[in-house]
């Protein structure tokens, strides 16, 4: 039987307030999320070990919070019990993020996710208590929305759906990750079964359609990540 699916706010509540900001985090908790996802990026991608760490998905964000400012806010009383999904956009600053989470007493409440398997290996060695999520796929846009790329995109998607259950379950069993963070187009019952059998969780991103959220809840995924947490109670 499927359990209760966690409500995860993408960048806080990115459709209610600008993502990765304090107003967005506040909106997310006001609308009953169980977990807040946010992005961490070094100010200078050439100096990830020394430059400021920012709450930003990419370098187009004009005035991002620093990681310290974001964590200081998220340790407030109103966020007690809310879990965090800290999404590392690049490799190279894993230790600094772990140290910041330790300083704020947030290790036990945090899952760190990333596209980069080598970052997960580093994180596991740095802090075994952390939950780790492997994000897939590594793409910057949805190629199924263009007529020029539609057919090759669906061909890739069919192959990925066949291969991903075994690959993801292998990473879970090897201890490299505790969860898969998968784009909704990759989610199948076979993927969920493989992850459950391996002892892993499945979080699905980024779902901004109410009916699709309902289908994923019925399937029994661990968590659904959305820009608009109001959709969880809509209808």
What is each residue range found by the language model?
Residues 1-235:
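Phosphate-group recognition and catalysis centered on beta-loop-alpha active-site segments
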């Amino acid at each position: 039987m499927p359990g209760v699916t966690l409500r995860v706010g993408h960048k806080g509540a990115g459709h209610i307030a600008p993502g990765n900001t304090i107003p967005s985090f506040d909106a997310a908790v006001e609308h009953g999320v169980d977990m807040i996802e946010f992005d961490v990026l070094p100010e200078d991608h050439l100096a990830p070990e020394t430059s400021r760490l920012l709450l930003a998905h990419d370098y187009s964000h004009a005035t991002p919070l620093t990681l310290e400012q974001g964590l200081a806010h998220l340790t407030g009383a109103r966020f007690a019990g809310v879990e965090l999904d800290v999404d590392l956009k690049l490799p190279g600053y894993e230790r600094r993020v772990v140290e910041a989470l330790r300083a704020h007493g947030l290790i036990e409440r945090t899952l760190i996710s990333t596209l980069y398997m080598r970052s997960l290996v580093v994180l596991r060695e740095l802090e075994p208590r952390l939950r780790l999520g492997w994000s897939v796929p590594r793409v910057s846009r949805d190629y199924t929305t263009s007529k020029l790329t539609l057919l090759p995109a669906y061909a890739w998607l069919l192959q990925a759906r066949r291969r991903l259950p075994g690959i993801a379950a292998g990473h879970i069993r090897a201890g490299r990750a505790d969860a898969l963070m998968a784009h909704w187009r990759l989610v199948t019952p076979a993927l969920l079964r493989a992850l459950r059998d391996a002892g892993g969780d499945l979080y699905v991103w980024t779902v901004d359609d109410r009916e699709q959220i309902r289908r994923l809840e019925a399937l029994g995924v661990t968590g659904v990540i959305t820009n608009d947490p109001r959709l969880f109670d809509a209808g």
